Amino acid sequence: MGSRILVINPGSTSTKVAIFNEGKISFDAEVSHPRERIDKFSTVMEQKEFRSAAVMDLIKDELAKGTPDMVVGRGGLLKPIPGGPYSINDAMISDLESGRYGVHPCNLGAILAREFAEFWEVPSMIMDPVVTDEMDPVAKVTGLPEIKRRSVFHALSQRGVARSVAAEMGLEYEQAKFIVGHMGGGVSIGAHRYGKVVDVINALDGEGPFSPERSGTLPILPVLNLVESGQYTFDEMRKVVTSRSGVLGLLGTNDMREVQARMEEGDDEARLVLEALVYNASKYICSFIPALMKDDPQKRPIDAIILTGGVARSKLLVKAVEDVVGFIAPVKVVTGLEEMEVMGRGGLAVLRGEMQPQEYHSD
């Protein structure tokens, strides 16, 4: 079997694809989807044909060079499972389509991967889905008995950049301590302690700092008042806090380049929002110091704070965060297609028999 691998990664406002040949990226592309176009769909699943057409448009010229031997999709919101590769099966597709464990465009990753793989009659898989769960039990406890915190984060991105930085620093990932912040349309932060992600900021459930599109942590009673007053239904509120708030709600745009330009032109409101974004991100990064010091008798220092994701491309924002949290550990920035590379490497390892894909079973 060859090792030509197609990787599909649907995000909140973009779709990325990459083609790997013998473990190296031979082609990668990304298409941005304007918010007004995405908002025409009432559900994520309604975007399937739109996203499928976007993928085909990106790769159509590459298909003349040969069809893939495997398709790897971004993992979606499934039940909590260990990390690693998983074959895409009916149980997985059912849970993703129904939104049983949550609704997000990443749910389309496995669905699109399987669709293309079945057309070419090749295997399909996901790698390190966002529901990878290695949280310490103590980190899941809340003050409300009916609610436990969930491990939902950018597992693929965070593990990929953490391993990359560990290698750069001459460390084994399993021997290092990192705080990793993925800053995209949503922000997730993870405490990586000796190879396990023992606590996370779960942006999907509304935790953590606000981001370009999400509200982040909110005082709960005012939120309940908004719903009780009839200003929002439950479904409307869920959509607002997960995709129509944050910088978008405050300034009317989720494009951080536009916000930065407005600030540089003297827009005081844009300046305040950017300063608040940096303050909130820094505050939650610092909140993970206990997670990395807990159960470590040597109290070994944190090796690095790692920033990744689209927002990490802004030198101004990265410098502002570094000025606040740099006293804890060196700040490393990793941008680019790390998620795509991690998925491609995972697919290659499976094709070569170096890793065995696990089977997903629905509860």
From Swiss-Prot:
GO molecular function (one): ATP binding
Family matches, as Gene3D superfamilies: 3.30.420.40
Coiled coil feature spans: none
GO annotation (BP), single: acetate metabolic process
NCBIfam families to which the protein is assigned, alphabetical: butyr_kinase, PRK03011.1-5
Family the UniProt entry places it in: Belongs to the acetokinase family.
Name this protein carries in UniProt: Probable butyrate kinase
Keywords noted in UniProt: ATP-binding, Cytoplasm, Kinase, Nucleotide-binding, Transferase
This enzyme's EC code(s): 2.7.2.7
Compartments, as annotated in UniProt: Cytoplasm
InterPro entries: Aliphatic_acid_kin_short-chain, Aliphatic_acid_kinase_CS, ATPase_NBD, Butyrate_kin
EC top class named in words: transferase
Pfam family, one: Acetate_kinase
GO terms under cellular component: cytoplasm
PROSITE patterns (alphabetical): ACETATE_KINASE_1 (PS01075), ACETATE_KINASE_2 (PS01076)
